Amino acid sequence: MPRHGRQRLGGRLLQCGVPFIGASARIAPGVGRPLESQVSAPGGTGTCHRSQRVSAMVGSMAQGVETGIMREPVLRAWMQDSVPPTTHYHERPGRWVGESSWPPKNMRERTYTPEWPGVLNADAVSVERRIMTVQSPLSAGLFAGKWCSYAATPDLPHDQREEDDGALVFTSPPLSNPLEIFGAPTVALNLSANRPVAMVAIRLSDVQPDDQAARVTYGLLNLTHREGSAHPSPLTPGQQYRVKLTLNHIAQRFPAGHRLRLSISTSHWPLAWPPPEPAQLAIETGTSRLVLPKRNARSSDAHIAFAPAEGAPVCTKEQLTTPHHNWRVIRDLAADTSTLEVINDDGTVRFPDLDLDLQRRALEWYSYQGMDFCSARGETLWERGFRRGDWSVRTVTCTLLTSTPTHFQLHAQLDAFEGERRVYAETWNEDIARDLV
């Protein structure tokens, strides 16, 4: 079943009270909220214990075999330790934590209030209401990394100071004690906009003593969907709204001496397509809130352990051409254009047991010019090919997405080759109404 289908099914089972097991190496942000709360793991697919957990559950529930899994925590997750920001990690230090229910019964909320002139204050009782405005450049988001990292590094978010120049930033004093959060932080904002279509991007970062800022979690909202996606409606410019965002679930430890940072921006390109025109948000400080799901460390967490991961034998393969993975930000100061180039080239791999060569390459470009929000442009080139002896086949797909104030413009081309002869080709050109996007 496709990933999103599995998550929708898991969410329905949770709502009906049906027992099920969810096991995953990663959580795709923003999808399958009920199921997302139930599973998490620290590494890529190569380090996950999914098969062993599923086997133990099936043995216990379907076959009546005593596997011990029913005495284990209902939920286990990897509580990440603080690390300096970088676009790739060899490992993420931390520890396993477990809960007997979700949401956990002993979870406590810790509330922070954004205050003038940029302070994030814990448990504020009475503070002055002030209006602070933000209108972000399209560069806000260039260093955000991939929507869902697939370990094709360097695709993780970089030092968030690169992003904070285009954001409204609130930073807490240094923590006097370590803080652990587990779950989905929420943000409630009193805001108004000067345009009928606008978006807000919110990031929570771990600010280290040397001022490096590592993104912990984030959330995006098209403000025309402020009351849900079933019936979006334009904003009334100048009218204040109470808007709530749920950030992506996370398990994170903030050491003493570190600071929390809440960053608010009005664009997050290219993770989110920008609105039709630049919009300014007016945020009311003193009444807006950041609520963190605070979890106290427990000695029982030390007893959570897994056997070494098991898997099928690795197939024999030979790397015929060198793979190349990179992300590059290119600034053309003369033309005032910025481009994010993503290179995901796996090269050519040979599988001797099958006498088969496999070639995979994906290139992506995301660009814009100045503050022209309708200059945003996303382009992809994907190639896939197989070769055995004198026989070879490959496909090439090119996709280009641009926009006007009223429509998205999609241009796509598919070519299929057998040897050097093109055996199939198709082209698409479509205009799609933006519909408050």
Regions found by a protein language model. Name each.
Residues 37-42, 50, 54:
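Active-site-proximal cap/lid insertion segments
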Residues 8, 12, 42-48:
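Alpha-helix capping and helix-loop boundary segments enriched in small/acidic/polar residues
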Residues 2-5:
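Short beta-strand/loop motif that positions the catalytic acidic residue
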